[in-house]
Amino acid sequence: MIGKLSGKIDSQCDDYVIIDVNGVGYLVYASGTTLAKLVEGRFYKLFIETHVREEHIHLYGFLTLEEKNFFNLLQSVNGIGTKMALSILSNLTPTDIKIAINNDDKNIFKAISGVGDKLTERIMLELKGKIAKIFSSSAIIKDSSNISSVEINEVIKALVNLGFTRFEAQNTVQGIITQNTKISIDELIKTALKNRNSSF
């Protein structure tokens, strides 16, 4: 599975780019927002979401982890696939989506082609709790740290994958950052694992 590509933008089309990585060209689909920021001939790092199907392998690229997270989050809504998720992200930033859902602003989604009343209702209903759960804890921790909320959420997810419960990961991260607000992401993970092992 490909998680990241660093290379030069070789060419660009309406919904994808070809990124040259050491002489190999990868076709990467992206949102209109991301495509608008990419310039042919320049080097970029793209975070990649790989979709493997029987008939194809598709790569989806993002300049930020937050956009990648929202790409996956949107697809958790019944009726939203990769194309619709990219369409939404071509019109709205992750911040726009968070604010709209928190404020119950349905009109912002209805303005997007292909998003009708029923899909808008599902987006509001199915994502409201998920967004609150994912971002509330990291936003609270962010207030006392130089690490972004998205990075904190990635650390929490990494710790969960390493055996922590989500509650345990959140509390551990918050405790470490409170003691050292300038800690790096790598050190944050190492310290969390060290503290957990020493408690057994």
Swiss-Prot record:
Keywords: Cytoplasm, DNA damage, DNA recombination, DNA repair, DNA-binding. The keyword Lipid biosynthesis does not apply. InterPro entries: DNA_helicase_Holl-junc_RuvA_I, NA-bd_OB-fold, RuvA, RuvA_2-like, RuvA_C, RuvA_C_sf. Residues 147-200 are annotated as: Domain III. Its main location: cytoplasm. Residues 142-146 are annotated as: Flexible linker. GO terms for molecular function: ATP binding; four-way junction DNA binding; four-way junction helicase activity. It is found in: Cytoplasm. One of its GO terms (cellular component) is cytoplasm. Residues 1-63 are annotated as: Domain I. Pfam families: HHH_5, RuvA_C, RuvA_N. Belongs to the RuvA family. Has three domains with a flexible linker between the domains II and III and assumes an 'L' shape. Domain III is highly mobile and contacts RuvB. The RuvA-RuvB-RuvC complex processes Holliday junction (HJ) DNA during genetic recombination and DNA repair, while the RuvA-RuvB complex plays an important role in the rescue of blocked DNA replication forks via replication fork reversal (RFR). RuvA specifically binds to HJ cruciform DNA, conferring on it an open structure. The RuvB hexamer acts as an ATP-dependent pump, pulling dsDNA into and through the RuvAB complex. HJ branch migration allows RuvC to scan DNA until it finds its consensus sequence, where it cleaves and resolves the cruciform DNA. HAMAP family: DNA_HJ_migration_RuvA (MF_00031). Homotetramer. Forms an RuvA(8)-RuvB(12)-Holliday junction (HJ) complex. HJ DNA is sandwiched between 2 RuvA tetramers; dsDNA enters through RuvA and exits via RuvB. An RuvB hexamer assembles on each DNA strand where it exits the tetramer. Each RuvB hexamer is contacted by two RuvA subunits (via domain III) on 2 adjacent RuvB subunits; this complex drives branch migration. In the full resolvosome a probable DNA-RuvA(4)-RuvB(12)-RuvC(2) complex forms which resolves the HJ. This is Holliday junction branch migration complex subunit RuvA. It comes from Rickettsia typhi (strain ATCC VR-144 / Wilmington). The gene is ruvA.
